[in-house]
Curated annotation (Swiss-Prot):
Disordered, as annotated region: 119-139
Listed SUPFAM superfamilies: C-terminal domain of alpha and beta subunits of F1 ATP synthase (SSF47917), N-terminal domain of alpha and beta subunits of F1 ATP synthase (SSF50615), P-loop containing nucleoside triphosphate hydrolases (SSF52540)
Residues reported in the UniProt entry to bind ATP: G169, D170, R171, Q172, T173, G174, K175, T176
Site note Required for activity, residues: S362
Identification of the protein by name: ATP synthase subunit alpha
Cell compartments where the protein resides: Cell membrane
Length: 502
């Protein structure tokens, strides 16, 4: 079979026309220095701030410093295998984390990778970890309560959905316990909880996860953990990863609670990164933008307007103080960003008053408008009474002959302190809180010996559950107090059957 010359030429033409050359242009750079979670690379002229970069061994990095001749990269993973002279290439993607309901019940690292040994997570969506906070017109004022189940907080320092309430105190004063109790109390509240552990011991995080699992709270909780053994970039990114996961739910009209435990360690990690990147240090060696580090995170907590779906993110950031010094740099920064603070005092904690809330220094700037009417009515004077008692208590140590009014205030104060004590992991529904505070503020407990107050409380709750369930149901469903006569009659009836220990 002979092939004609014109056939050969047409075949060659066809081949040339159908030939496709896949030329990939990649922007690459060279590592010139590496160490302590930081790499310095030459090249990569067109890189974006915050862009993900890939090293030759597959480890990812994030562009942080953009300079004239080189870029500073924070390494998101083990950096021991990255060498001077290695290639680093652009991905064209901004740092993102996986989001969605598939994450509920799981423990992940700040990159959204599972670390609980329960296999991969099949998410379908992701969100950038840095995103703009909702604007003024997209927000609505805080008006729905977030019940923590902790008497001293729900009565005196109430928190609303969409609020940012700082929890501040020395180490070992019960900050994490407040977080866990608040998560446990959201069981039937249709609230998604995100617990971000920053720089905690792995054993501590495991304990928190186990507590949540045993009490059925892990089903509506995501745990994001950057432990103390992780490199500084992971600790720096963890809070942003947590709030991005929360935003996915918020923009779909759901309510989210995000707990950052704690932001002092994030600030320390950011200081470490900044100093390694040769950024100029400021007060306490923190970089100049450490305020912006926290403000851009906490401004993403909001109560959205109805037009945007009415979802919310409530933020509970933690700050650890040194010897109760709330006037240090990071504490004052975060106090000025948030809508109030709950101050936990170590001497109250050690004297057996737990939760160790200092009512005088704690404040909630917007939570009052979110309280239910019944709670507002019964707890109105509670904070002032407690603050007055603290003053009188110090004063009364010097003199024994006190007038009747002062003695009555001291007696009421002692009973108030006892009522506000609460056991660990024992959150209380709001209707029971209203009932016991009503009994306290209306003077029904003034004749109960101080040592019997807690027994009075538990027996009173049992009595209400069995005999006066309608009163509790009324508070829960309507948010209002029952008729005064009915409530008083119920308390009087219970007191007849209550026997004091002395």
């Amino acid at each position: 079979m002979s092939i004609k010359p014109e056939e050969i030429s047409s075949l060659i033409k066809q081949q040339i026309e159908s030939f496709q050359s896949d030329v990939q242009v990649q922007d690459v750079g060279t590592v010139i220095r590496v160490g302590d979670g930081i790499a310095l690379a030459h090249g990569l002229e067109n890189v974006m701030a915050g862009e993900l970069l890939e090293f030759s061994n597959g480890v990812m990095g994030m562009a942080q410093n953009l300079e004239e001749n080189n870029i500073g990269i924070i390494i998101l993973g083990p950096y021991t295998d990255i060498r001077e002279g290695d290639e680093v290439k652009r991905t064209g993607r901004i740092m993102e984390v996986p989001v969605g309901e598939e994450l509920l019940g799981r423990v992940v690292n700040p990159l959204g990778q599972p670390i609980d040994g329960l296999g991969p997570i099949a998410t379908t969506k992701s969100r950038p970890i840095e995103s703009p906070a909702p604007g003024v017109m997209d927000r609505k004022s805080v008006h729905e309560p977030l019940q923590t189940g902790i008497k001293s907080i729900d009565t005196m320092i109430p928190i609303g959905r969409g609020q940012r309430e700082l929890i501040i105190g020395d180490r070992q004063t019960g900050k994490t316990a407040i977080a866990i109790d608040t998560i446990l109390n959201q069981k039937d509240e249709d609230m998604i909880c995100i617990y971000v552990a920053i720089g905690q011991k792995d054993s501590t995080v495991a304990g928190v996860v186990e507590t949540l699992r045993q009490r059925g709270a892990l089903d509506y909780t995501i745990v994001v953990s950057a432990s103390a053994s992780d490199p500084a970039p992971m600790l720096f990114l963890a809070p942003y990863a947590g709030v991005s996961m929360g935003e996915e739910f918020m923009y779909n009209g759901k309510h989210v609670l995000v707990i950052y435990d704690d932001l002092s360690k994030q600030a320390s990690a950011y200081r470490e990164l900044s100093l390694l990147l040769r950024r100029p240090p400021g007060r306490e060696a923190f970089p100049g933008d450490v305020f912006y580090l926290h403000s851009r995170l906490l401004e993403r907590a909001a109560k959205l307007s109805d037009a945007k779906g009415g979802g919310s993110i409530t933020a509970l950031p933690f700050i650890e103080t040194q010897a109760g010094d709330v006037s240090a740099y990071i504490p004052t920064n975060v106090i000025s960003i948030t809508d109030g603070q709950i101050f936990l005092q170590s001497d109250l904690f050690y004297s057996g008053i737990r939760p160790a809330v200092n009512a005088g220094l704690s404040v909630s700037r917007v939570g009052g408008s979110a309280q239910i009417k019944a709670m507002k009515k019964v707890s109105g004077t509670l904070r002032l009474d407690l603050a007055a008692y603290r003053e009188l208590e110090a004063f009364a140590q010097f003199g024994s002959d006190l007038d009747k009014a002062t003695q009555a205030k001291l007696n009421r104060g002692q009973r108030t302190v006892e009522v506000l004590k609460q056991d660990l992991h024992n959150p209380l529904p709001v209707e029971k809180q209203v009932a016991i505070i009503y009994a306290l503020t209306k003077g029904f407990m003034d004749d109960i010996p101080v040592e019997d107050v807690q027994r009075f409380e538990s027996e009173f709750f049992t009595f209400l559950d069995h005999n006066k369930k309608d009163l509790l149901d009324h508070i829960r469903t309507t948010g209002n107090l029952p008729e005064d006569a009915d409530f008083k009659a119920a308390i009087e009836e219970f007191k007849k059957g209550f026997s004091a220990s002395k």
